[in-house]
């Protein structure tokens, strides 16, 4: 496999052009996706504590994963010049079992690598980065097959994917900033209650926590409209390049070249 240096600015420009020509509005699809995720988050917040609360939290997390798969599949269709309706968001239900299994297995491997040190955990996360894309493209493959394909596809591209994420970090930080601030305040007050018995406030800035959570979710939705479809489409461009140069998936290439992020491993 020969990897190549990907022209990131060009990929972003091409993604923007593709999204402008999409037959179904990317902003409309993003708004629907983020609104559904926000609704699931609020449902989880209403679930309370105890067994029922845990069950609702797990269920909403799984549903969010299905919606995320559907959004990526929409972006895949955009890159192919195909029409993908709003119902594409729910296409992940057709292979939800494999989707859940893939998340569990990759999370398990990443946790194992993270136990060695922080950096191996990060590298492992990038090693399995394309596994979900392989599964979305071909739901007939097995979970371990998707993971193995991703391991071969990401050889030579982990560092480039890391730089890609850094290039969108400002947008991600902007989208999550209000939620991070609210979470920090809530964590601080809960700690004070546990240690010193000081009751945690039920409101912040004169508003109930649930209302603030809703406001933070709307903020995240609005910011996501500005960058999220482009980010996914650019990530898919990297995936397509990795498939072509690795010969795994579509295309074929010569023998492998390794970079410093790609030491062979026997675990995951």
Task: Mark where each language-model region is.
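Hydrophobic alpha-helical membrane segments
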Residues: 1-268
């Amino acid at each position: 496999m020969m990897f190549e240096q990907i022209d990131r600015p060009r990929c972003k420009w091409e993604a923007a052009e593709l999204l402008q020509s999409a037959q179904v509005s990317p902003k409309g699809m993003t708004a629907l996706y983020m609104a559904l995720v926000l609704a699931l988050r609020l449902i989880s917040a209403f679930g309370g504590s105890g067994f029922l609360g845990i069950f609702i939290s797990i269920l909403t997390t799984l549903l969010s994963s299905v919606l995320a798969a559907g959004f990526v599949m929409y972006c895949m269709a955009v890159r192919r010049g195909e029409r993908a309706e709003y119902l594409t968001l729910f296409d992940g239900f057709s292979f939800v079992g494999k989707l859940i299994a893939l998340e569990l297995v990759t999370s398990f491997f990443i946790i194992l690598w993270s136990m060695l040190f922080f950096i191996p955990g990060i590298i492992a996360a990038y090693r399995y980065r394309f596994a979900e894309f392989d599964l979305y493209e071909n739901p007939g493959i097995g979970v371990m097959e998707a993971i193995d394909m991703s391991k071969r596809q990401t050889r030579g591209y982990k560092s480039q994917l890391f730089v890609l994420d850094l290039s969108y970090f400002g947008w991600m930080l902007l989208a999550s900033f209000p939620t991070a601030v609210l979470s920090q305040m809530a964590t601080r007050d809960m700690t004070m209650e546990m240690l010193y018995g000081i009751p945690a406030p039920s409101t912040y800035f004169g508003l109930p926590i649930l209302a603030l959570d809703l406001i933070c979710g709307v903020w995240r939705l609005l910011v996501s409209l500005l960058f999220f479809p482009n980010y996914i489409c650019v990530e898919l461009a990297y995936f397509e390049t990795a498939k072509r140069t690795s010969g795994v998936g579509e295309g074929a290439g010569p023998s492998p070249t390794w970079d410093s992020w790609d030491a062979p491993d026997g675990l995951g």
